[in-house]
Amino acid sequence: MEVHERMIKRLVYRVSDIRPYINWLYFYHTWSMNGKPKEEKEKLRVEAETMLDEFETRYKTYAVFGIFDANSDEDDILIGDVRLPLLRQQRAKDNCSPHLCLSDFLRPLSSCIKDKVGAFATTVDTGMEFDYKHDDFRQMMAKVLAERLAEGTAEKMHEDVRRTYWGYAPDEHFTPEELHREMYQGI
């Protein structure tokens, strides 16, 4: 699909659509499980999978993305009549490498050639975080899983944008683990 001027889409996913995209490494990190016995991790994972099964019939995840014509003008990004002022990297550098800015990655306005910029947001049904308020452990588990599902939704949406909506990598087939390792080219 060719993107003209702008495209805005809202996507709705089932929990089962997102489960393969959950990064369990960060799930364990949130629970401070690094260095813990494998049995403890497996027990926690079983509890998480059980809760995800509960989520399947009750909740969804959501993504919205937009792809817009854009150009750069010095440190700013221009999207239609909107000017987004941006900062260059601020940290001191020991070598001669440049202080980059997001605008450096777009064609300049002076080129008279439109470029593209994208933006997205993801979320989950709010009940995931608030329906377990009478059980501290389950509430914490729900919040951690909601965070992982929102992140997994971003991974799934990113794949869908690349393969379907923007369509510049329609034949690309990566596993969720390969996507987590950013083995793709481009955005």
For the regions a language model picked out, list residue spans one by one.
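Charged, low-complexity helical/coil segments in non-catalytic cytosolic or luminal regions
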Residues: A150-T164
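Short terminal or interdomain "cap/linker" segment that borders an active site or interface and mediates
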Residues: T164-I187
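Short alpha-helical basic/polar micro-motif
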Residues: E147
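Active-site loops and adjacent core secondary-structure elements that bind or stabilize anionic groups
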Residues: M1-M140, V144
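Intrinsic structural disorder
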Residues: M1, S110-I113, E151, P170, ...
